[in-house]
């Protein structure tokens, strides 16, 4: 395995990225704007200024020849999740903050229309790329963000969200996390199985990064649509709990899904301080040789970590990774799939499943809501409308 891509490979990488959009599966720029700039997007110029905080700004994205990215509208798990308590009312602040983050991303897209364009479909990604814009897709990072409500999931979809990670660092009402102290559902809960069906119906991509092995297995046995791991790596290269084991990767192949390799040093090697671009390449090659390059992508997690692996310092450095893949003799047709072709295919397949379910008249997942009227008032209403009461009895 070569140590540094030369100019020839960088030129070939640039040429490839002029033909095919590089789509990053997970980017936390919105989180750092919330943390450092308190969501005030007019205090700095994110398209022109130098030396801005973090791994991401528009100049870096352009230098990195980025064709599209999933912006994460991430909000942390509430404290109750840490003790496996999932009360509905405790998620109200989580839902509010998620809406704030979705709004932030949409405002950034509106503020920088020469560079960013909202994409909600696979064809929309290609359209944005052809128009010279960075296709901007939205994801949420954990179903704690929907507050135990499929109605909220649907509203997020209507706002443009196209993938939902099932868990973050803690369990929730739907599924177990890879990093929780103990499981509570042994994979998916009953509600979790219902929400998987709803996500298939809706056309929401299921993201299994952060989930436990049993959760991933349960989902892969149930889902009718391909899934993704938006920012994970291979357990067979480095045995970290956030990485994906071979048995799950083989199921992923059967599912026609996608694992998008992360740049997080702790996921990349046993020595995070020395984790490098070459370790990311090792993970990509490992998965490609195990299950095929049709199932590998890139999910950096930029701005979701203090420091990325050496050699991939920020979004401007993506061409170095692409050049290294070419230098390691991965056929350019496969590299095109890795950088974005696979994600576009998966998204199109998810859309097709949703379309078929619509044709089959699969109904949306309804939920129990807090009672508005008591039985006595319902009886008064029923007495006022005897015809309706008679129809209800049929």
Swiss-Prot record:
Source taxon at top rank: Eukaryota
Which PROSITE patterns would you find in this protein's record?
RENAL_DIPEPTIDASE_2
Give the binding site residues for substrate. Answer: 168, 242, 301
What's the name of its gene?
A: sirJ
List the protein's name.
Dipeptidase sirJ
Catalytic function, reaction form: an L-aminoacyl-L-amino acid + H2O = 2 an L-alpha-amino acid
Q: Please list the cofactors this protein needs.
A: Zn(2+)
Entry function: Dipeptidase; part of the gene cluster that mediates the biosynthesis of sirodesmin PL, an epipolythiodioxopiperazine (ETP) characterized by a disulfide bridged cyclic dipeptide and that acts as a phytotoxin which is involved in the blackleg didease of canola. SirD catalyzes the O-prenylation of L-tyrosine (L-Tyr) in the presence of dimethylallyl diphosphate (DMAPP) to yield 4-O-dimethylallyl-L-Tyr, and therefore represents probably the first pathway-specific enzyme in the biosynthesis of sirodesmin PL.
Its annotated pathway reads: Mycotoxin biosynthesis
């Amino acid at each position: 395995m070569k140590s540094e891509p030369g100019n020839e490979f960088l030129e070939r990488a640039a040429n490839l990225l002029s033909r095919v959009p590089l789509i990053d599966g997970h980017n936390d720029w919105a989180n750092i704007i919330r943390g450092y700039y308190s969501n005030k997007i007019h205090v700095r110029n994110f398209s022109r200024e130098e030396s801005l905080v973090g791994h991401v700004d528009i100049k870096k994205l352009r230098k990195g020849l980025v064709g599209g990215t999933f912006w994460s509208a991430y909000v942390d798990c509430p404290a109750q999740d840490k003790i496996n308590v999932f009360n509905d009312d405790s998620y109200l602040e989580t839902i509010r903050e998620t809406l704030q983050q979705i709004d932030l991303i949409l405002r950034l897209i509106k503020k920088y229309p020469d560079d960013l364009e909202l994409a909600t479909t696979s064809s929309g990604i290609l359209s944005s790329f052809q128009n010279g814009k960075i296709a901007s897709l939205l994801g949420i990072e954990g179903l704690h963000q929907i507050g135990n409500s499929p109605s909220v999931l649907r509203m997020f979809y209507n706002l443009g969200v196209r993938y939902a990670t099932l868990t973050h660092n803690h369990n929730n009402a739907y599924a177990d996390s890879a990093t929780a102290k103990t499981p509570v559902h042994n994979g998916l809960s009953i509600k979790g199985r219902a929400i998987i069906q709803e996500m298939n119906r809706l056309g929401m991509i299921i993201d299994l990064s952060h989930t436990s092995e049993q959760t991933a297995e349960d989902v892969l046995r149930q889902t009718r649509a391909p899934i993704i791991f938006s920012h994970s790596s291979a357990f067979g290269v480095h045995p970290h709990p956030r990485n994906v084991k071979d048995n799950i990767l083989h199921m992923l192949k059967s599912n026609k899904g996608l694992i998008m390799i992360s740049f997080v040093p702790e996921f990349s090697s046993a020595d995070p301080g020395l984790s490098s671009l070459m370790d990311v390449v090792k993970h990509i090659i490992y998965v490609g040789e195990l299950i095929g390059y049709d199932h590998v992508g890139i999910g950096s997690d930029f701005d979701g970590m203090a420091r990325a692996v050496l050699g991939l310092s920020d979004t401007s450095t993506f061409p170095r990774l692409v050049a290294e893949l070419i230098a390691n003799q991965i056929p350019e047709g496969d590299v095109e799939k890795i950088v974005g072709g696979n994600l576009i295919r998966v998204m199109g397949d998810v859309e097709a499943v949703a379309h078929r379910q619509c044709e089959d008249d699969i109904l949306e997942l309804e939920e129990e809501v807090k009672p508005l009227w008591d039985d006595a008032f319902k009886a008064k209403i029923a007495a006022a409308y005897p015809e309706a009461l008679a129809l209800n009895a049929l």
